[in-house]
Design a protein with these regions (language model features):
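Surface-exposed loop/turn segments and immediately adjacent short secondary-structure elements
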Residues: 1-126, 133, 137-141, 158, ...
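Short, charged alpha-helical motifs in flexible N/C-terminal segments and linkers
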Residues: 1-19, 50-95, 100-107, 113, ...
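Basic, alpha-helical interaction scaffolds
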Residues: 274, 349-419
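Active-site palm subdomain of RNA-directed nucleic acid polymerases
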Residues: 146-163, 185-187, 264-290
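Catalytic palm active-site di-aspartate
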Residues: 71, 110-113, 130, 162-166, ...
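Short, conserved micro-motifs composed of acidic
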Residues: 303, 318-355
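Conserved polymerase palm-domain catalytic core
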Residues: 198-283, 292
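Conserved catalytic palm subdomain of right-hand nucleotidyl-transferase polymerases, strongest
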Residues: 67-75, 113, 124-134, 173-217
Length: 532
């Protein structure tokens, strides 16, 4: 494997990776110590809402997964869990003192980095690994309380288009919103839909702690949360371990460690002021923007990209031009793709144009067909069916084999299914169902498919997808749901309340009138048309 063109030996690998991670943020200045100390000196006694109770610490300790890998302090999670009643009182005092002073001890900030491959085999270290930080177990417990306080405040002003690591939001909801915009726009064949899939380069590693601190202050975060959160990040040290080889520890000026509870929260806050006038979604560091126009030279998306580049320059972030892609969706005959100018990023580098892109685990194609995604799922699970054969031949109880099937195969076939289920063709739906038939045939060789479903207690995959869609839509119908605004009421809420007895049989939402069959591939339109 190589790093920046140089071959790296296994013995040198941990130090090389650690030095590379340090070099990423070396140019970013460390935390302004005087400003942080002034903030700490302004802290008064912790408000009652920020005082952790001994019982809460006891519950957190007793819920630790005993199988968790020890952090760099080598403190056993099993020991902490089994002796939670003994550790609760002293740990509670330490956490409350840490919050009151806005100081996190260096032992809690030391992390062991495990490089997780993004692909196999790893060839380019700068692109093919994700550094996951393992922190002390006690630090994670303290983080869990601070993350709760952080979110209580942040949820009041979080960007409505941010779906990542947020209660009540998920990848499925993000994809439903995004796909709905695409399908609605494509119902008019004159519309040219340009989608920009943005990839940040080393996003978590480039977070400037000073800028993060000022953003917390600007958004009126309680000073105890601000001081503690920045203290957890400043002057932190890390080392890389691969097998039995360990690097030397090195300090970092910037960045949020991936694998911690506070990492995604800090990043979401950092990019919370990154907004667009165009339709867009954010899932932590995954950002997607779309422009809809009947003019092939409409500059809206280019302007959005220019604004993004300006934001990155101010916030010390970088766009990975090589991984940032554009997809054009157009069903008209008036223009050719060649009439649509390429997007230009930094230094006039063109953004590559693709016909298919994998967004949050789901493949979107320029023809708004799910063939690419279905093929991807079938190929992925085909390699796993062999495990069902092995378990069955080994004489493992059939109920246990069914559980394995549900865990490693069915879960893949149902990921974000409300997004793509409405647009499946009969052939695609049948090919997905055939995977379950094949697995049950292996587990129950003497039974037909209907009998195997009864014995195993499973439903047809098509039935499960329909139930999942109906259940999710029932949630969206609640007025407080994130996506409820996508539904247009037939009458005003006040009128509905006055006449609710008369209107029980009346469907409360407008049914979309589609010009083409494409609109009915949208989850929202599908559910409304079927009056779920």
């Amino acid at each position: 494997m190589t790093l920046q063109g140089n071959t790296v030996t296994p013995h040198d690998l941990p130090d090389v990776i650690n030095n590379f991670l340090f070099d990423i943020s070396e140019s970013i200045p460390p935390v302004d110590g005087k400003f942080l100390n002034d903030l700490r000196s302004s802290l008064v006694e912790s408000p009652p809402s920020f005082v952790v109770s001994e019982y809460a610490v006891y519950r957190a300790l007793s819920r630790i997964k005993t199988s968790s890998v020890p952090g760099p302090d080598l403190l056993s999670s099993r020991l902490l869990s089994h002796l939670s009643d003994i550790f609760a009182a002293p740990l509670c005092s330490i956490i409350n003192l840490s919050i009151r002073q806005g100081i996190v001890s260096w032992q809690w900030k030391l992390s062991r980095v495990t490089p997780v491959p993004k692909c196999n085999p790893v060839q380019r270290l700068e692109d093919d690994i994700r550094p996951i930080s393992i922190t002390p177990c006690l630090a994670k417990i303290a983080e869990s309380f601070m993350s709760s306080y952080f979110n209580d405040h942040f949820n009041d002003f979080i960007d409505d288009n941010q779906f990542g690591s947020t209660k009540g939001r998920s990848t499925t909801l993000a994809l439903i919103k995004f796909s709905h915009d695409l399908f609605v726009a494509s119902d008019n064949s004159a519309n040219i839909i340009r989608v920009l899939f943005i990839d940040f380069s080393k996003a978590f590693d480039l977070i400037d702690h000073n800028k993060l601190m000022h953003k917390m202050i600007q958004n009126n975060f309680p000073p105890h949360i601000t001081a503690w959160s920045i203290s957890f990040l400043e002057n932190r040290n890390q080392f890389v371990r691969i097998g039995n080889t360990v690097s030397s520890a090195i300090g970092l000026n910037a960045g949020c460690p991936q694998g911690t509870l506070s990492g995604p929260n800090n990043f979401k806050l950092f990019i919370n002021d990154l907004t667009f006038s165009l339709p867009y979604i954010k899932y932590v560091d995954d950002t997607t923007v779309a422009s809809i126009s009947n003019d092939p030279c409409d500059p809206a998306l280019q302007q959005a990209l220019d604004d993004l580049c300006s934001w990155c320059a101010v916030n010390s972030m970088k766009i990975n031009v090589n991984k940032t892609k554009e997809m054009v969706i157009y069903f008209g005959r008036r223009f050719q793709l060649s009439n649509i100018p390429m997007l230009k990023a930094i230094n006039d580098a063109s953004v590559a144009r693709v016909n298919c892109f994998k967004l949050l685990g789901v493949h979107f194609s320029a023809d708004l067909n799910w063939k690419q995604h279905v093929d991807f799922m079938l190929d992925k699970v085909a390699k796993r069916i062999y495990y069902i054969y092995l378990l069955t031949r080994a004489g493992v109880n059939s109920n246990h084999v069914v559980e394995v099937y549900c865990s490693i195969i069915r879960s893949v076939l149902e990921y974000a299914s409300p997004v793509w289920h409405p647009g499946l063709t009969k052939t695609q739906s049948k090919s997905i169902e055939c995977i379950q038939k094949r697995c049950l045939r292996v587990i129950f060789p003497d039974l037909n498919y209907k009998e195997a479903l009864f014995v195993s207690g499973l439903l047809r995959l098509s039935e499960r997808r329909e139930i999942s869609a109906r259940d999710l839509f029932n949630q969206i119908k609640r007025p407080d749901h994130t996506l409820h605004y996508l539904l247009t009421p037939r009458i005003s809420p006040a009128t509905a309340e006055l006449n609710k007895d008369k209107l029980r049989s009346c469907y409360p939402f407008e049914i979309p009138r589609a010009k083409t069959s494409r609109l009915n591939k949208s989850f929202i339109a599908y559910c409304l048309t079927n009056r779920f």
